[in-house]
């Protein structure tokens, strides 16, 4: 009868049966050996990556560290304020001339929506009214109407 060999533990089990393999694989020593095996493998992969990067750098295939120069400076220019003219309603001072006016909320203009977000709703519900879509639904009718006078 063939014996089962465990590569992680470098040992033969007494015989090849599912119960013996299951018992062995749930043991503490086997689990420690598996963990050690994969830790060693990850260290070897990391060292290989470091060696390959170093060789490529020495060969001139990789430029200097792009992170040492710092982030690129944004090209921001703030337009000068308009003299002798008050800002129009819904327009924030300093906004580009072609920008649309912002929506007016109860506390002034609302900020523009963030990327990936819906714009705010146009209609604000009044007190006592549920928001749109949250009202009461009509009762659901069953397939057959109920009989009032059964015979």
Swiss-Prot record:
InterPro entries: Matrin/U1-C_Znf_C2H2 (IPR000690), Matrin/U1-like-C_Znf_C2H2 (IPR003604), U1-CZ_Znf_C2H2 (IPR013085), U1_snRNP-C (IPR017340), Znf_C2H2_sf (IPR036236). SMART domains: ZnF_U1. One of its GO terms (cellular component) is U1 snRNP. Its main location: nucleus. GO terms for molecular function: mRNA binding; pre-mRNA 5'-splice site binding; U1 snRNA binding; zinc ion binding. Coiled coil: none annotated. A zinc finger (Matrin-type) spans 4-36. The keyword Zinc-finger applies. The keyword Methyltransferase does not apply. Keywords: Metal-binding, Nucleus, Ribonucleoprotein, RNA-binding, Zinc, Zinc-finger. PROSITE patterns: ZF_MATRIN. It is found in: Nucleus. Gene3D superfamilies: Classic Zinc Finger. One of its GO terms (biological process) is mRNA 5'-splice site recognition. U1 snRNP is composed of the 7 core Sm proteins B/B', D1, D2, D3, E, F and G that assemble in a heptameric protein ring on the Sm site of the small nuclear RNA to form the core snRNP, and at least 3 U1 snRNP-specific proteins U1-70K, U1-A and U1-C. U1-C interacts with U1 snRNA and the 5' splice-site region of the pre-mRNA. PANTHER family: U1 SMALL NUCLEAR RIBONUCLEOPROTEIN C. Component of the spliceosomal U1 snRNP, which is essential for recognition of the pre-mRNA 5' splice-site and the subsequent assembly of the spliceosome. U1-C is directly involved in initial 5' splice-site recognition for both constitutive and regulated alternative splicing. The interaction with the 5' splice-site seems to precede base-pairing between the pre-mRNA and the U1 snRNA. Stimulates commitment or early (E) complex formation by stabilizing the base pairing of the 5' end of the U1 snRNA and the 5' splice-site region. Belongs to the U1 small nuclear ribonucleoprotein C family. HAMAP family: U1_C. This is U1 small nuclear ribonucleoprotein C. It comes from Anopheles darlingi (Mosquito). The lineage of its organism: Eukaryota, Metazoa, Ecdysozoa, Arthropoda, Hexapoda.
